[in-house]
Amino acid sequence: MSDRNIRVEPVVGRAVEEQDVEIVERKGLGHPDSLCDGIAEHVSQALARAYIDRVGKVLHYNTDETQLVAGTAAPAFGGGEVVDPIYLLITGRATKEYEGTKIPAETIALRAAREYINETLPFLEFGTDVVVDVKLGEGSGDLQEVFGEDGKQVPMSNDTSFGVGHAPLTETERIVLEAERALNGDYSDDNPAVGQDIKVMGKREGDDIDVTVAVAMVDRYVDDLDGYEAAVAGVREFVADLATDYTDRNVSVHVNTADDYDEGAIYLTTTGTSAEQGDDGSVGRGNRSNGLITPNRSMSMEATSGKNPVNHIGKIYNLLSTEIARTVVDEVDGIREIRIRLLSQIGQPIDKPHVADANLVTEDGIEIADIEDEVEAIIDAELENVTSITERVIDGELTTF
């Protein structure tokens, strides 16, 4: 019998898939908020690896306060220019010296930011189109938690906070998530006019799904208005076809709905991101740790990206709760929907939450009592192995936005 406080109980109400109205959003990789998330997390991983390499364990740090101030640009068919650069400030705390070993935390952060920007925004020139500044205050060596090679020590929670996860994704959630990933993957490789700043909003009313896509088109690959219209039409057709892989419901796709062709007002950019023209960004203001913004579901407002992966509950419990939810749905029959909530208590071991709460919607004919033991056993096993989240985050196996 586990000594962990695990609760399994039914959800009052209908599963999201069965509700009359559902809203789902995803901010793509090039969106200013997602850029901040991605840079903060890439810096976090780089710092964690550097600490392990130099002193054998992860020291105290956090980089989850990264901010982006938009620049200005003059896009034009065939190619425009950035007039005022984007300004990015990486801020937070980092341990810069430990037991006589100096760690160049700000240099590591700057290098990681450059790598991420070059990989994510190929049309943005580092140092000219975007200026990056790093201000990391000194972290206290006393606050660091051990993450040694054996990975056996269970850290104490750094805060009284909670994480939330759910499974499975609804049809609308899958469409929104996979549409952005596909557009920012093979589709943009084959169609370079499609920039990386892609936002997808899904709305379902009954069996009718509307998908609204905003795509920052890249001016150097668009010769004229006809070329722009063709690029928009291509995105519309691609997303409509993709949606049929995930649903039999009626799907309508709308792309760049603010365009006014008569006035020449279109979503044309020089760099592939709205950050070039007045759209600021911040860590934690976009996707939750499962990659989506889901107002039909419970969500934690914690920023997951950039947080220390050893004992920061805002990161660990959001990722772990999602992992638990997915595992339960995969391994236990008869579950229509599950929500996992994990609550920590500061100073207590992270493998023993103050409460681990599983809320289930079951299939017809399935009672909670029929599957309660199975669900509890999975939650217990996942909590027992909580330190694997730290390892997988540092290795880049888990995404935070």
From Swiss-Prot:
Residues 287-305 have a biased composition (Polar residues). It catalyses: L-methionine + ATP + H2O = S-adenosyl-L-methionine + phosphate + diphosphate. The keyword Transferase applies. Pfam families: AdoMet_Synthase. Its EC number is 2.5.1.6. Pathway: Amino-acid biosynthesis; S-adenosyl-L-methionine biosynthesis; S-adenosyl-L-methionine from L-methionine: step 1/1. It comes from the Archaea. Its cofactor is Mg(2+). It is an enzyme of class 2 (transferase). GO terms for molecular function: ATP binding; magnesium ion binding; methionine adenosyltransferase activity. ATP binds at G137, E138, G139, S140, G141, D142. GO terms for biological process: one-carbon metabolic process; S-adenosylmethionine biosynthetic process. Residues 272-305 are annotated as: Disordered. Keywords: ATP-binding, Magnesium, Nucleotide-binding, One-carbon metabolism, Transferase. NCBIfam families: PRK04439.1-3, PRK04439.1-5. PANTHER family: S-ADENOSYLMETHIONINE SYNTHASE (PTHR36697:SF1). Belongs to the AdoMet synthase 2 family. Catalyzes the formation of S-adenosylmethionine from methionine and ATP. This is S-adenosylmethionine synthase.
